[in-house]
């Protein structure tokens, strides 16, 4: 069962014991309740919280909630194309900035390149736009959790690297989401430099 609306206690136990409560980014997922990507979002958030805790970062992600609010696929595609081509980003509708949370995960209904954007670029929140899972590459085993984690990495400020064995590999390198395919459930790792960057969050 998905753990929406309840923050895992483990996110807060260590900081409380050390006297420093973590900052939290509440996550709002925009998509239908039966979307298969919801489970992968939860797994990706758990992955990032493990990474953030391991480097003693003061940031955690969660809790996770879901909204039936939708964003037009045409706008999502325009944002994706603008990121890929270095063009000016079109803003999201103002109503989306009024949604609760600090990070929006938008589950698109069509196919384009998924993207992750730091807070303030298209909305008040950080935004991860995730392509449809109706077909490859997201329908391939182990891809969805890693692709979503990859885009959340961009929301956290990480950039692409060129190592195909690493989570954040991407353009202009030839890494593509299908490389995450595996019969074993696992997340691809971060580089030492990326872990150091997380420590400053």
Give the ranges of each region predicted by the language model.
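Acidic/histidine-rich, surface-exposed loop or edge segments in extracytoplasmic proteins
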Residues: 21-35, 130-132
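Bacterial Sec-dependent signal peptides at the C-terminal "C-region" and cleavage site
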Residues: 4-26
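Metzincin-family zinc-dependent endopeptidase catalytic domain
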Residues: 38, 42-149
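Active-site-proximal beta-strand/loop segments in catalytic clefts of secreted hydrolases
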Residues: 30-32, 106-111, 132-133, 158, ...
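Intrinsically disordered, low-complexity proline-rich regions
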Residues: 1, 11-13, 41, 184-188
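Active-site recognition of the HExxH zinc-binding catalytic motif
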Residues: 146-160
């Amino acid at each position: 069962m998905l753990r929406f609306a309840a923050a895992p206690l483990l996110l807060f136990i260590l900081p409380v014991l050390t006297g420093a409560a973590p900052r939290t980014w509440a996550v709002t997922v925009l998509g239908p309740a039966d979307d298969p990507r919801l489970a992968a979002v939860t797994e990706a958030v758990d992955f990032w919280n493990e990474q953030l805790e391991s480097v003693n970062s003061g940031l955690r992600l969660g809790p996770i909630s879901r909204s039936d609010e939708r964003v037009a696929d045409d706008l999502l595609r325009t944002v994706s194309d603008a990121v890929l081509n270095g063009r000016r980003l079109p803003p999201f509708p103002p109503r989306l900035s009024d949604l609760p949370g600090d990070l929006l995960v938008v589950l698109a209904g069509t196919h384009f390149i998924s993207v992750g954007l730091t807070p303030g670029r298209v909305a008040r929140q950080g935004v991860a736009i995730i392509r449809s899972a109706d077909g490859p590459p997201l329908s391939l085993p182990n891809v969805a959790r890693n692709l979503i984690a990859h885009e959340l990495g961009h929301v956290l400020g990480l950039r692409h690297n060129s190592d195909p064995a690493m989570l954040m590999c991407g353009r202009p390198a030839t890494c593509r989401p299908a490389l995450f395919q595996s019969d074993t459930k696992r997340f691809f790792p971060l580089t030492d430099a990326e872990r150091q960057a997380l420590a400053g969050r």
